[in-house]
Amino acid sequence: MEKRKIILDCDPGHDDAIAIMMAAKHPAIDLLGITIVAGNQTLDKTLINGLNVCQKLEINVPVYAGMPQPIMRQQIVADNIHGETGLDGPVFEPLTRQAENTHAVKYIIDTLMASDGDITLVPVGPLSNIAVAMRMQPAILPKIREIVLMGGAYGTGNFTPSAEFNIFADPEAARVVFTSGVPLVMMGLDLTNQTVCTPDVIARMERAGGPAGELFSDIMNFTLKTQFENYGLAGGPVHDATCIGYLINPDGIKTQEMYVEVDVNSGPCYGRTVCDELGVLGKPANTKVGITIDTDWFWGLVEECVRGYIKTH
């Protein structure tokens, strides 16, 4: 099995923590580094959350802090979903893990420039780090094997009727990424909302056990509460983890090639990913957009990763 070399760019975040847990453990993934961006909460909080997850699960991967603000717009956070810390729910031991001194954008540029074009970027938060790296050093573009991102929707948004949170948090950054010419795979809400974590799924991961089973339970029990309060849903989607699922086995997720454009005009559609599902514009597709996911396969994959953290000695 080929190991996919990835840099996971995230804004932890409950579903981000599940993505970190999966990416660090599955044998099909070679997690080179974790870069942190502001998004679900401010950068100081998302950085601590990422370090806490790595410390709890003994994930020995370097963590880099990146962009604390969007490129242009005023900052927004998703405290209604992720709480005051950005990862409310779990209780962590005192933090001793530290971030690297290098800025995440510099790390992304340096790592790509030194590579053979075999590294995939996996941004599951706002695209600020990726866009700034592209603008600072355009020579990285041909070095990126693929970008597999969580964001957008070809249907309805979740932060506004038009826009999904990650794109709405920095639409200008998303515009840079979607016009970059790099091969893109987009896991939008239409797909990620199919991965609804119900109490049955939580109980399954608790039975699987180990530190990751405990963390999954603490994280998703909080998510169930906020999803019900905000959207009336009886479960919480694990949006970001779908990107890791796709990288492990793309056959579990059906995609359709579309031309996708990000609306950066101020107005009710600001931050919308306009997906030409029917091909009416006649423009060449620039994105593989996730349509459906085999949920039985997906939860089996999550459980496999959870079990990977159980110590056998």
From Swiss-Prot:
InterPro entries: I/U_nuclsd_hydro_CS, Inosine/uridine_hydrolase_dom, IUNH, Pyrim_hydro_RihB, Ribo_hydro-like. It catalyses: a pyrimidine ribonucleoside + H2O = a pyrimidine nucleobase + D-ribose. SUPFAM superfamilies: Nucleoside hydrolase. Coiled coil: none annotated. Its EC number is 3.2.2.8. It is an enzyme of class 3 (hydrolase). Disulfide bonds: none annotated. Substrate binds at residues 227, 239. Ca(2+) binds at residues 11, 16, 124, 240. Gene3D superfamilies: Ribonucleoside hydrolase-like. The active site is at residue 11. Its cofactor is Ca(2+). Transmembrane segments: none annotated. One of its GO terms (biological process) is pyrimidine ribonucleoside catabolic process. Binds 1 Ca(2+) ion per monomer. Keywords: Calcium, Glycosidase, Hydrolase, Metal-binding. GO terms for cellular component: cytosol. GO terms for molecular function: calcium ion binding; purine nucleosidase activity; uridine nucleosidase activity. Belongs to the IUNH family. RihB subfamily. Hydrolyzes cytidine or uridine to ribose and cytosine or uracil, respectively. Has a clear preference for cytidine over uridine. Strictly specific for ribonucleosides. Homotetramer. This is Pyrimidine-specific ribonucleoside hydrolase RihB. It comes from Escherichia coli O1:K1 / APEC.
